[in-house]
Amino acid sequence: MEAPPVTMMPVTGGTINMMEYLLQGSVLDHSLESLIHRLRGLCDNMEPETFLDHEMVFLLKGQQASPFVLRARRSMDRAGAPWHLRYLGQPEMGDKNRHALVRNCVDIATSENLTDFLMEMGFRMDHEFVAKGHLFRKGIMKIMVYKIFRILVPGNTDSTEALSLSYLVELSVVAPAGQDMVSDDMKNFAEQLKPLVHLEKIDPKRLM
């Protein structure tokens, strides 16, 4: 899967603080084709991408109460594609008028020895999974419809089983901090997917 699009804003010094705006939902297996058909009609005039990714979640425990989390992901169906290292910050849930969950996001392409490097840095792998699905685009919005597979034998991505009888649906935008108006566009797009799927601003802490 590709990295999020890079902003075209000029950088005069330092780095741009990028944020991920996110809405999430799910759809049962038997409703998948109807949702795919709807997305084909609503999204940009191009064939949706398919992806098959292996993701590993690494933790680094320190003095702080909660561990530092990094995600390493690689494509299993695109030979030569780089590994991606991703950091997702704590969600900003305070603004009730904001229609999407917002969190700091850093996503970079790396060399293939990423996991060895993380282990040398003191991280340990917490869990891993395979994600398989479809990727649609609508302007700067990215819509992912995918199923998560549990890896039965650690490190063996050929030995998996589906985690549930549904597909996750994620609508996201990666943009510089302060561009909260994108959440309005996301809400309007999400409304067009009802009643097939209800995309919501979900606090991950509610799922713990």
From Swiss-Prot:
Family, according to the entry, reads as follows: Belongs to the Mediator complex subunit 18 family.
Q: Name one GO cellular component term.
A: core mediator complex
Q: One MF term in GO for this entry?
A: transcription coregulator activity
Cross-referenced InterPro entries? Mediator_Med18
Keyword match Phosphoprotein: yes
Transmembrane annotation, as ranges:
none
This protein's name: Mediator of RNA polymerase II transcription subunit 18
Biological processes annotated in GO: positive regulation of transcription elongation by RNA polymerase II; positive regulation of transcription initiation by RNA polymerase II; RNA polymerase II preinitiation complex assembly
Q: List the disulfide bonds.
A: none
Asked if the record carries the keyword Cell membrane, the reply is no
Superkingdom of this protein's organism: Eukaryota
Native source organism of the sequence = Homo sapiens (Human)
Q: What does this protein do?
A: Component of the Mediator complex, a coactivator involved in the regulated transcription of nearly all RNA polymerase II-dependent genes. Mediator functions as a bridge to convey information from gene-specific regulatory proteins to the basal RNA polymerase II transcription machinery. Mediator is recruited to promoters by direct interactions with regulatory proteins and serves as a scaffold for the assembly of a functional preinitiation complex with RNA polymerase II and the general transcription factors.
Principal localization reads nucleus
